[in-house]
Amino acid sequence: MKKVTFLFLLFAWLMCGGCTNQTDMGYVPVSGEGKIYYEEKGEGEPLILLHGHSLDTRMWDLQFDEFARHYRTIRMDFRGYGRSSKQTETFQFTHLDDLLAVMDYLKIEKAHIVGLSMGSFVAGDMVAMAPERMLSCVMASGGIRSVQGPSEPMGAEESARRDKEIAELKAKGIDVYKREWLETLISDGGSRREEMRKPLWQMIDDWDAWQPLHKEVRMFWAREAWKRLEETCPSVPTLMLRGDSKGEGKPYSPKELKYLPNGTALLLPDCGHMMNMEQPETFNRAVLQFLDGIK
């Protein structure tokens, strides 16, 4: 009887992947009665994946399971994207504030942060504004933005310019805009760029395109983050990645590294902006080797 019970328990354990292969998901309450959707898998040090503009958690499909073999891996939809709450033109928030709220809710004191494109803007904000919450930082296809931050609200001239841009976009049609945006992301790629077309379009097609059709609040610390970075020179281990789709091998020396003493930069061959989707094996290896090197 004991043997039968043991075998049953062993079978159940294997069927649930040792109880570590399950993906937990849920919502985190954030400011302004908002909520952030997240998924979590794996054990170990926390690692959080931050997606790009017009995309969502699915852009990390080729990283999520792999990283979860080594880390407690979390991916989340930013406010205004995927299954998270919508944005408004009036409520001021930053994506960094939402990220920190997710970490607090999940009882994560520090995490490895991996962001691509818009996600790298948030990762850059964090390394400057909240380095004490980071184990490491990976910024791919981007870095800290050089635009107005929350302390510089939109003025009349910028508001009028946005009115004109929004009217032009509505006249063009959002479907045309989405198709053009898709081609922009794909045309930047290397030899495997067409492999991204279907998964990229699935996300872009599902996206409600609220952002280009409205006047967004300042969601990035941006210039304020640059000022803080230059003042503090945080010691967070940092990796900055850029794709080299043309094989030109041009030097990559992002300005951020001047103020990040434990930072390094790396070119990834045969890929463009969406490097994690285009060359997932190369991207995963670069990130995991970087993380292994700082343990």
Model-assigned labels for residue ranges:
Residues K2-L47, R69-Y71, D292-K295:
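Alpha/beta-hydrolase fold catalytic core
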Residues G34-R83:
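Conserved HGGG/HGGXW glycine-rich cap/lid loop of the alpha/beta-hydrolase fold
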Residues K41, D65, R75-M118, R285:
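Active-site loop/oxyanion-hole signature of alpha/beta-hydrolase fold enzymes
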Residues V122-M126:
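Hydrolases whose catalytic domains are alpha/beta-hydrolase-1, hotdog thioesterase
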Residues A128, L135-K170:
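Flexible "cap/lid" loop of the alpha/beta hydrolase fold
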Residues P153-M154, E168-T232:
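Conserved alpha/beta-hydrolase catalytic His-Asp/Glu region
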Residues G263-K295:
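Catalytic active-site module of serine/aspartate enzymes centered on a nucleophile-bearing elbow/loop
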